[in-house]
Amino acid sequence: MMKTLSLQSRAKTTALKQPKEIFAFARDIDGEFVYDQKIVKDENVSYYYLPDSKIDGSIDLQAGYAKFKKIPEEKNMSDMKCLLTALTKYEQEHNNGEKVNVDIITYRGLMTKLLALPYNLNDPVDLNVLAYDGQLFINSDEEIELARRKEEDEHKQQSMTPEKYDHMKRCEFSGYKFEAIATLPKPWADCSRQQIDKRGKKMVNNYEQYISVIKTGIGEAKMLLAGEVDCVWDYIPEDGKDVLSHYMELKTTRILESNGQVVNFEKKLFKTWAQCFLMGIRKVVYGFRDDSFFLRDVELYKTEEIPLLIKNNALTENKSGGKINCTTALKWYGAVIEWLLQEIPRDDTSKAYRVSFDPSTRTFTLRELMGNENSRLRNGEMLTSEFKQWRESIQK
């Protein structure tokens, strides 16, 4: 069975259910996951602190590049196992021993791909979908995703000069470096002078992650999304209410010196809007660097204002492929979620499914995965035995 969804499909509503954090978990410097809510909030959250006086052109975003502690790609996937471990603990300890009331459980990054797809038609998508216990579980296919990352990297190495490839890798590093110099491990008042002043010397890594798990949805669909949060803008409320409004996204990009660069930045800004909007994160800070990787400027954007910035950009008025429209993207996203919930029976555990977008044919499809693939996903790759045992115990 293969079904196709037209790229012109649009849901009638763009009503997004107000995102609300229900718990968080973290990955530490050693790649181990932390689930204890108090430890996660006390020890794994970063706080934004970068006064204007520090942005004087002396912050080098490639300093420490040679010592970058980079997590291997195979360990840096959207890991469903750790999400299900965290979800089990939440249901057992904070949800009266009941399963969370949602239709779909997945990662924010994967939904960002779907939301942004109408304006990113060159990016392939391959997601696996399982029905279990009345809910859909969606994750990237690890084998396909890893092979794709490897192929892309090899292609870049072959098509670029060594200098250009090195520059690209330093661009990637500069984003993590910006996070390191723009954040503190605790609120400013609780940090020592050394913690504040020595951030530029801190070893940069992409192991550490703070992951917020929220309840949200679009239209009639209720969803649970897990997504990385870069830092806290000010403080975390003691009562834990409306914590999402205190989170912030950090990004870096090259300084804008031409119309073409402004147009490319708009594409980045659209993707940033998509990932923040889905999580209910209201602020984004962009660090602008020069070609020598020195930080030249910092700009704060409010997530809710980005659609208007894009709409009012005169440079993209007559753009081929159409002007980016955030409402159109939301209506597409709503149509995809609606379609998946209609087409996949949530009580059928005999099949798994793959959702794919093929840029070469511009087709968005859903097909059944039978036999071995279904078994592989249900027995370890997506669903864990511990999670299934927990859910079976509360069905009895």
Swiss-Prot record:
It comes from the Eukaryota. Signal peptide: none annotated. Divalent metal cation. One of its GO terms (biological process) is deadenylation-independent decapping of nuclear-transcribed mRNA. The keyword Mitochondrion does not apply. GO terms for cellular component: Las1 complex; RNA polymerase II termination complex. A divalent metal cation binds at residues 179, 230, 249-250. It is found in: Nucleus. Pfam families: RAI1 (PF08652). Its cofactor is a divalent metal cation. GO terms for molecular function: enzyme regulator activity; metal ion binding; mRNA 5'-diphosphatase activity; nucleotide binding; phosphodiesterase decapping endonuclease activity; RNA binding. It is an enzyme of class 3 (hydrolase). Interacts with RAT1; the interaction is direct, stabilizes RAT1 protein structure and stimulates its exoribonuclease activity. The interaction also stimulates RAI1 pyrophosphohydrolase activity, probably by recruiting it to mRNA substrates. Belongs to the DXO/Dom3Z family. Decapping enzyme for NAD-capped RNAs: specifically hydrolyzes the nicotinamide adenine dinucleotide (NAD) cap from a subset of RNAs by removing the entire NAD moiety from the 5'-end of an NAD-capped RNA. The NAD-cap is present at the 5'-end of some RNAs and snoRNAs. In contrast to the canonical 5'-end N7 methylguanosine (m7G) cap, the NAD cap promotes mRNA decay. Also acts as a non-canonical decapping enzyme that removes the entire cap structure of m7G capped or incompletely capped RNAs. This is Decapping nuclease RAI1.
